[in-house]
Amino acid sequence: MVCALHAVPAHHRRVVTPAGDDPSGPAGSGDRAVAAAAERAKLTAGRNIPSFDDLPLPADTANLREGANLSDALLALLPLVGVWRGEGEGRGHDGDYRFGQQIVVSHDGGDYLNWEARSWRLNDTGDYQERGLRETGFWRFVRDPDDPSESQAIELLLAHSAGYVELFYGRPRTQSSWELVTDALARSRSGVLVGGAKRLYGIVEGGDLAYVEERVDADGGLVPHLSARLSRFAG
């Protein structure tokens, strides 16, 4: 049973992030980030996600050197493909906390990217404390032949383990950063009550994946919720 279905208010639909929190960095940083990622790939190039080899269709791969070729429709998202691990900071109803996270971005040659993010809370000494947020979904590009302006619009469809599904829309900001905002959100009867969100992802100096997320609070305003910097582990 769906208990809530609503869009983010129109005046919240443009992401405005302070310069100091912008993962995309200054002009030209995208080229440097891609070059740094290529250097780091020498250490991670031999790793990939495990797969079974007895299915009659292409296997998922998080390594662009292995498996099916990435669809041409996804070239603007190519830097995201891989396995990413690191730490971040969150803000919940019980205050601020630190978390560890792994994000797996893979594909099978289709016109979408698979997305899985798992996190765990850390204690004061940086050790595992408890399970955290988890989400899975798909990145796609909008295809509307009647509206050419939508050719670079991104769809991100997510299902959250906390009991809600979320549809984001956004666009690439640069060749290595992407900006998205919640367009619709549906909560199950047992799901947590949350507001819509804005996310900014970017490949930053050193080839890391960084992001910030703001969510709408009970008063209708955007407040900081999550931020993290993750290093490439595979791909």
Swiss-Prot record:
Cofactor(s), names only, from the UniProt record: heme b
Record protein name field: Peroxynitrite isomerase 2
UniProt free text on domains: Forms a 10-stranded antiparallel beta-barrel structure able to accommodate a hydrophobic ligand in its interior. In fact, this fold hosts the heme group, which is located in a wide surface cleft.
Pathway: Nitrogen metabolism
Keywords attached to this entry: Heme, Iron, Isomerase, Metal-binding
EC main group: isomerase
Residues the entry annotates as binding heme b: K198, H225
Function: Heme-binding protein able to scavenge peroxynitrite and to protect free L-tyrosine against peroxynitrite-mediated nitration, by acting as a peroxynitrite isomerase that converts peroxynitrite to nitrate. Therefore, this protein likely plays a role in peroxynitrite sensing and in the detoxification of reactive nitrogen and oxygen species (RNS and ROS, respectively). Is able to bind nitric oxide (NO) in vitro, but may act as a sensor of peroxynitrite levels in vivo.
EC number from the UniProt entry: 5.99.-.-
Cofactor note: Binds 1 heme b group per subunit, that coordinates a highly solvent-exposed Fe(III) atom.
